[in-house]
Curated annotation (Swiss-Prot):
Protein name stated in the entry: Conotoxin Im6.1
Keyword Secreted included in the entry's annotation: yes
Main location: secreted
Family, as annotated: Belongs to the conotoxin M superfamily.
Pfam families assigned: Conotoxin
Protein species of origin: Conus imperialis (Imperial cone)
Single GO MF descriptor: toxin activity
Tissue-level expression: Expressed by the venom duct.
Keyword match Protease: no
Cleavable signal peptide: 1-20
InterPro entries recorded: Conotoxin
The organism's place on the tree of life at top rank: Eukaryota
Pro-piece positions: 21-47
Length: 81
């Protein structure tokens, strides 16, 4: 048997030993956290930017990156020196 075959066979034997009941759910929690992190990252990446308003969870575009308050409305502005 090749080295890869031995490693795969060993991993197959260890899988039943690491179940959520025996490890206190640590592996399950890690998998769930990883999925949530991926989902949040994809939500952030796919979120479209708004060049004018930054309320209701909208994100300002890079051209006007700063969210500022103008008479109660949150607008995207560019701060210059």
């Amino acid at each position: 048997m090749s080295k890869l075959g031995v490693v795969l066979f060993t991993l197959l034997l260890l899988v039943p030993l690491v179940t959520p009941e025996r490890d206190g759910g640590k592996w399950t929690m890690l998998a769930k956290n990883k999925k949530a992190m991926k989902r949040n990252l994809m939500d952030f990446i796919t979120r479209t930017c708004d060049p004018y308003y930054c309320n209701d969870g909208k994100v300002c575009c890079p051209e006007y990156p700063t969210c500022g308050d103008s008479t109660g409305k949150l607008i995207c502005v560019r701060v210059t020196d």
